[in-house]
Design a protein with these regions (language model features):
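Residue-level signature of catalytic and energy-coupling elements of molecular machines
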Residues: 18, 59, 89
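Long amphipathic alpha-helical segments used for membrane anchoring, targeting, substrate engagement
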Residues: 1-43, 98-121
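Ordered, soluble secondary-structure elements with a strong preference for glycine-centered loop motifs
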Residues: 8-9, 15, 74-90
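A short acidic/small-residue loop/turn micro-motif
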Residues: 68-72
């Protein structure tokens, strides 16, 4: 009598489940790339004195916008004004990064550490 390996169906089901999880992870990654996250500084939500940084959920910056009053407030020949503008820009980027991290955790959190499976996924 030949041995038939009693758990062949279990392994096949496990591979199907792994493939399904991989597809879900890829979908979540694609959603992060398409998502728009806004980082603000200098006046809260999109005001005249606000710096806005546009990025996707994977922290790729797609644009930067300065409110209309920023140009009136900043003299690029004045070191203090340039430093203020740099600080506003960094604050907006960091705000966007924080929001992107939150979105990443929402999308990828259910997968735990599965991304570390290397070639298996």
């Amino acid at each position: 009598m030949a041995y038939r390996g009693g758990n062949g169906g279990g392994m096949q089901n496990m591979m199907k489940q792994a493939q399904k999880i991989q597809e879900q992870m890829q979908q979540a990654e694609a959603e992060l790339e398409e998502m728009e996250v806004l980082g603000f500084s200098g006046g809260g939500e999109e005001g005249d004195e606000t710096v806005v940084v546009y990025m996707n959920g994977k922290k790729v910056i797609n644009g930067i916008e300065f409110g209309s009053k920023i140009s009136e407030m900043v003299d690029l020949s004045d070191e203090d004004d340039v430093e203020m503008l740099e600080d506003l820009l960094m604050a907006a980027i960091n705000d966007g990064y924080k929001k992107a991290d939150e979105e990443y955790k929402k999308k990828m959190g259910p997968f735990g550490n599965l991304g570390g499976l290397g070639g298996l996924m």
